A protein has these predicted regions:
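Hydrophobic residues embedded in beta-strands of well-ordered beta-sheets
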Residues: 161-163
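A short N-terminal helical cap/helix-turn-helix that marks the beginning
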Residues: 1-2, 92
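Short, basic/polar amphipathic helix motif occurring as a linker/hinge flanking DNA-binding modules
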Residues: 2-5, 97-99
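Radical SAM [4Fe-4S] cluster-binding motif and immediate context
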Residues: 166
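Short, Lys/Arg-enriched alpha-helical recognition elements, typified by the DNA-recognition helix
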Residues: 3-84
Length: 171
């Protein structure tokens, strides 16, 4: 029974505060990015979400170059919000089953050539800023940006020239 209907955005705002106490900060950051950048612009004003709308959303994201994995992760967040709203009595929810095309080609990422990498690294060295330093460390070590952002001085052994990666953060 639905009483006091709410929009998906209203439900998501309440869900975020409830969910925050049960998940790590980095997990919550991923949920919030998914909501703000993808889900709420499409579903935020709606009082219910149909299978047809979710299917159209998934295909649109796929056509814009997102991977099935990324889209499935977004749909997990949407499902958590919708189920939360249903549990609170703010909306009715009928389970959806989203289908993805069977022969979706894998997206290929462009890779820097050695010459382009050297040119970029020279630029970063000649134009020092802390963000440029982070990019330079990524290019030089193969670390991910979240690993570089989480580095502490204690992770760097100047005697041996070793860098110890002990944590990561979500930007």
């Amino acid at each position: 029974m639905v009483n006091n209907k709410k929009t998906i955005k209203e439900i998501a705002d309440i869900w975020k505060e409830d969910k925050r106490q049960y998940v790590k900060q980095s997990t919550m950051a991923v949920y919030l990015l998914s909501l703000e950048n993808h889900l709420l612009p499409v579903f935020g004003g709606k009082m219910e979400v149909t299978e047809e709308e979710v299917q159209a959303f998934a295909l649109d994201k796929l056509n814009h170059g997102l991977s099935q994995k990324s889209i499935k992760d977004m749909l997990i967040v949407l499902k958590m919000v919708v189920r939360f709203g249903e549990k609170q009595g703010w909306l009715n929810h009928v389970e959806w089953k989203v289908k993805f095309p069977a022969n979706q080609p894998k997206a290929t990422l462009p890779i820097l050539t050695k010459a382009h990498q050297k040119k970029l690294m020279d630029y970063l060295k000649d134009n020092f800023t802390f963000p440029n330093l982070g990019i330079l460390v990524c290019l030089s070590t193969g670390l991910r940006i979240g690993e570089v952002c989480a580095l502490k001085w204690s992770d760097i052994n100047m005697d041996t020239g070793l860098l110890h990666v002990n944590r990561t953060i979500e930007r």
